[in-house]
Amino acid sequence: MPFVVAIPARFSASRLPGKPLRLLGGRPLIHRVAERALSTGAREVWVATDDVRIAEAVASLDGVHVAMTANTHLSGSDRLAECARIAGWDPEVCVVNLQGDEPFAPAAGIRAVAALLHHSNADMATLATTIDKSEDLFNPNIVKLVCNTHGEALYFSRAPIPWNRDTFATTREPTPLGPWLRHIGLYACNAGFLQRFTTMQPGTLEQIESLEQLRVLEAGHRIAVRITPEHFPPGIDTPEDLAKAEKALEDV
């Protein structure tokens, strides 16, 4: 199924300022993410940014387009809606939102989220993977989610969900067969839905959790979820994450 990849990138990340231009293996992080996108066979790859420094860094990459967007967007999806207008995509074009802090996202997983949207009746599609480490379950930078029996998201949270009332009263170790899932910050929706997203008001849940996908659920829309077999290392949110990613790159 044809799709495009769009990468929202802003310079003023609160936990890691200048994140897209931080070096990973001697190259800007945004370069590594964009090259992952190019490896998927996407019809087009775009970086949407409000910072000329990021735009100039991306300009040296063959096959990557840049959309200069407003600096007032509340979320990456809001930014990509403007990117879609700049690019002139038809409303039915499948847009994969690849976060700018996912330099190790496997190409197969990126293609899979586009396929999931195509084969589902949901308005949006995303990926998740299982959690088996307590430090991940209780880390607020790692987003958790719960799904219904139809493989659709019920809720996303920075808190450990579901909360095991009995087990967590005595230990913080998740059971090996527990239902805990880590959300992978990769979305697919069509360009028309991106425009609808911008008309939805951020709700209380989105504002409390600082999770844009909750705007979709609060507005009554559906998000299909695939439990992915591909390995997705956590994204880079902090200096510690960047150091871990550097080490992982050295170990390859």
UniProtKB/Swiss-Prot annotation:
Q: Which reaction does it catalyse?
A: 3-deoxy-alpha-D-manno-oct-2-ulosonate + CTP = CMP-3-deoxy-beta-D-manno-octulosonate + diphosphate
Query: What Gene3D superfamilies does UniProt report for this protein, alphabetically?
Result: Spore Coat Polysaccharide Biosynthesis Protein SpsA, Chain A
Q: Does the keyword Plastid apply?
A: no
| Keywords, comma-separated and alphabetical | Cytoplasm, Lipopolysaccharide biosynthesis, Nucleotidyltransferase, Transferase
Top enzyme class of this protein? transferase
InterPro entries assigned to the protein according to its UniProt record, in alphabetical order = Cytidylyl_trans, KdsB, Nucleotide-diphossugar_trans
The pathway it acts in is: Nucleotide-sugar biosynthesis; CMP-3-deoxy-D-manno-octulosonate biosynthesis; CMP-3-deoxy-D-manno-octulosonate from 3-deoxy-D-manno-octulosonate and CTP: step 1/1; Bacterial outer membrane biogenesis; lipopolysaccharide biosynthesis
EC no. given is 2.7.7.38
Localization of this protein: Cytoplasm
Entry's CDD domains? CMP-KDO-Synthetase
GO terms for molecular function, please? Answer: 3-deoxy-manno-octulosonate cytidylyltransferase activity
| Entry's Gene Ontology BP terms | CMP-keto-3-deoxy-D-manno-octulosonic acid biosynthetic process; lipopolysaccharide biosynthetic process
Pfam families, sorted: CTP_transf_3 (PF02348)
Q: Provide one Gene Ontology cellular component.
A: cytosol
HAMAP family (alphabetical): KdsB (MF_00057)
Which NCBIfam families does the entry mention?
Answer: kdsB (TIGR00466), PRK05450.1-5 (NF003952)
The entry sums up its family as follows: Belongs to the KdsB family.
Instruction: Please explain the role this protein plays, according to its UniProt record.
Output: Activates KDO (a required 8-carbon sugar) for incorporation into bacterial lipopolysaccharide in Gram-negative bacteria.
> What name does the UniProt record give this protein?
3-deoxy-manno-octulosonate cytidylyltransferase
Q: Which organism is it from?
A: Xylella fastidiosa (strain Temecula1 / ATCC 700964)
Which gene is the coding source of this polypeptide chain? kdsB
